[in-house]
Amino acid sequence: MAWEILIHPEVALWLQGLSDKEYEKVVATMQALAEVGPALGRPHVDRIKHSRLHNLKELRPLGSSLRILFAFDFQRRATLLAAGDKSSDWSNWYLINIPIAEKRFIELNDKNKK
């Protein structure tokens, strides 16, 4: 059974700005995530350390420094929460984007509970 992939509007905007080659890499990795779900591991997915969310992970399109932070919910969905290219700011990228992803995930879950 395939997993549903939801895309936060800010991530959707980011995707639109990618080159064709980058976009193809991201889509291929998203397709693998949809097919395999939480069992998809390295090199495509890695767990994020230092997050308040135990299930926060990063999608790692092969051969690139692009990263997409995402989390699974209890309804078999992965939500892409924050994205970017960490090549220009390798360590600070996570310091900036982990809190953004956490906040978006909590907001979406609160919204879905209503």
Residue locations for each model-derived region?
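Basic, Lys/Arg-enriched alpha-helical interface segments
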Residues: M1-S65, F74-A78, D85-K114
